[in-house]
Amino acid sequence: MIKYLKIKKNLVHQTAIINWKRVSIGTGNIIGPYVVIGNHPQHPTKKANGNIIIGNNNNFNEFCNIHLPTNLTRKTIIGNNNYFMNSTTIDHDCFIENNVILSSNVILGGNIHIMNGAQLGIRTIVHQNQIIGSYSMLGINSMITKKSIIEPGYIFYGRPVKKIKKNLIGLKRNKIKTDSLIKEKKRFKLLFKMKKK
């Protein structure tokens, strides 16, 4: 019998571990079995410094791990309506926007920014300090290296990833028109410049 507790208008499994002193959370979230939110950052020298901020209506499936930030940004941020499958790892200082899907066993290094509507396939690995563009799709078992550029609106696949084609189905599903995609591409370029300084 799976037992969930209602805490702060969220459903939290009784086996989940949440560092409530360092975690701010909205409403309508589902936090599954053995999820850990607020563990120390996976960094050999930097200590935790700051908080985790979680929005509304996110689903964290079993064994997800979300780590505290360092003094780099002092925030690990998760927006709204995201879906994280089992055993995903979100390391320190990450920023995940809205409507993002992380499939099972996805691993995000530190200080990664995932833009709206991106989908990462099973066992995708992302190098630290990367940006994943809006409405992009990363195929199963993909590897995003330091040199990868994941533009909005495209499908990428491989180890390391290569651009395959435009994500037409994903764009249609999310009702993204050309004007909206142009705006997201401009935002991606701005974030990319800031991240790569």
Predicted regions and their residues:
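Glycine-rich hexapeptide-repeat left-handed beta-helix
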Residues: M1-K8, I30-I54, E62-N65, P69, ...
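Short metal-binding segments enriched for Cys and/or His
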Residues: D91
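Conserved CoA-thioester-binding segment of acyl-CoA-metabolizing enzymes
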Residues: H13-I17, G32
